[in-house]
Amino acid sequence: MAPSVATSLKAEILPSPRTSSPSSNFKTCVSNENGCINCRCSPSEPHESANVDESVNKLSKTFSKLSLNPTFQALNMDLGLLHENITLDRIPKVPENHVSLIDIDEARAKEDPNFQIHSTPSRMPPHYVQPHPPFSVFPAPILDVRELTKPGAVKRVFHFELDVSNYPLPEGEEWMVGGSFGVMAPNNEEDVDELLQLLHINPDQADAPVLLKTDGGRWPTIWAEDTPRELVTTRRELLKWTVEFMSVAPKKQLIRLLAEYAKDDTERQVLLFLVSRLGQRAFCDLRDHNVTLITLLKAFPSVQLPLDHLLTVLPQLMPRWYSLSNDPKVSNNVLEFAVTVVEINKVEGGTRSGIGSGFLKRLALRFLNGERDLVLPMYRGLHKNAFATHFASDGPMCLIGAGVGVAPFRGFVQRRLTNATCAGKVWVFHGCRDQELDELYHGEWENPLQKSSDDDASSTVSQQTETEMDSFEVKKDGTSGPNHLVVESRSHQHAYVQDEIRHRGDIVWSVLSHPHGKVYLCGGKKGFLDGVENALIDVCVQYGKMSRLEATQQLALWQSPLNLKYIKEIW
């Protein structure tokens, strides 16, 4: 980690012995910016020249005051290069403002038939949010929610069931096994309230109608026509449904905008340093620590940021995608899916949930606490993801998933169980941390249409691997259902899915070498993808009698559009 701010400032802000005058001025100038090679955080943009005059004594005092701010301290920025003789160059120009907000009265607002003043938080996005035009976002009633993990699991996973009997499917389209759908998850109400407060917008202003004007682009519609637009909305509605301010690392455009509206000279100088060439390392480190706009506004409290200018630089709030965990043909007009709640460490301490998973967690808890009449804002999309378009109705298959990545394979198994001759040709490699706490859909793989209960008897037999506590389970009789192998890691010598792929290499190779065999992979990219693909290469080397280079090339060939024997969905 970088040295603490207090240490860096004390050492670097005091006048240098080589400086003849204690009132030397900071200098800032700009030129073309190359950006950061490591994180690619700074695209080439127009730059400007600027001079910032600040006496060293005044700067020292104000830095001391700034360092008392606990949020500023939590950023732990390395400001060692920021001293009285600094020359700041390659500072981006202030982003142009392409948005305006004009207050209007309610009578004028009612002229827009789509505008509604909500006395309670709206459950659905405004009409102009169109992720799949010309179709609107659909309020799918939530039929059921259950928690798939048990207390003590590292991550919580919830299962949802949605009623889509009234969904306006276009003629000739259907819900497909392996398909995915979009959820229009809003920003958390508490985060929106906090941001409004930091922007000095009171509740009456937040909910008052405004006329939004844009110079062009698709925002705030997502995918509507790229054109200038005027529409009636509210400030709260825009922050809740149309912009990302919690889940995207800050870009230099945003930092530069904060600097422009900082009333305190020292705060402005720190912000300019972060977007300068010399501050590149500090900027990249800042982006790596889950810093949000709210954190920055707390760390630099003198910033008086206008909402219209802020909306120009914030990215569009995009839909979150979830894979179906059931076969829609078997479960008529019901869509099922699972979601892992993502918890993110906050730089100032504590955790926060992800945008999509946090929204779904809040809905799940409300349902489990007895609340009904809940809906999920969702839409079908194109159903063009790899699993939906390349599901195989026959032939042997290996389904490899870790954590919630195994959920779409439940739908695969449901479909294959409708054909008794195909059921035993399916092998599910199911990775989890602890089978007792976080094995998903426990007891449902032999009959996925029947929900499990805590006292369900397992039809699997546990066998020990080379490590004392790591075990897998494999169904004894694979003729009447899928062969379900659970790989769990509970000891210091972890066993992962890739270990079981090697252990069962003969089975995996029998699928890969079959003319109609397919291997499906689903899970997180970090660690999991490389581990599984290395294991598949090892299987090809051992059982296919290939060199490692040949096996690597063969795996790539199996992923080509003309072959598609190996199909993956990775996030």
Curated annotation (Swiss-Prot):
GO annotation (BP), single: methionine biosynthetic process
Under the heading PROSITE patterns, the entry gives: FAD_FR
The residue ranges of the FAD-binding FR-type domain are 135-389
Provide any one GO MF term from the record: flavin adenine dinucleotide binding
One GO cellular component term:
cytosol
**InterPro entries membership:** CysJ-like_FAD-binding (IPR003097), FAD-bd_FR_type (IPR017927), Flavoprot_Pyr_Nucl_cyt_Rdtase (IPR001709), FNR_nucleotide-bd (IPR039261), NADPH_Cyt_P450_Rdtase_alpha (IPR023173), OxRdtase_FAD/NAD-bd (IPR001433), Riboflavin_synthase-like_b-brl (IPR017938)
The answer to whether keyword Transmembrane helix applies is: no
A Pfam family of the record is FAD_binding_1
Gene3D superfamilies named among the record's database cross-references: NADPH-cytochrome p450 Reductase, Chain A, domain 3 (1.20.990.10), Nucleotide-binding domain of ferredoxin-NADP reductase (FNR) module (3.40.50.80), Translation factors (2.40.30.10)
Which portions of the sequence form the region Disordered? Answer: 1-25, 447-479
- This protein is called what? Uncharacterized FAD-binding protein C12C2.03c
Give the family this protein belongs to, as stated in its UniProt record. Answer: Belongs to the flavoprotein pyridine nucleotide cytochrome reductase family.
The source organism is Schizosaccharomyces pombe (strain 972 / ATCC 24843) (Fission yeast)
Keywords carried by this UniProt record: FAD, Flavoprotein, Oxidoreductase
Provide the cofactor list for this protein: FAD
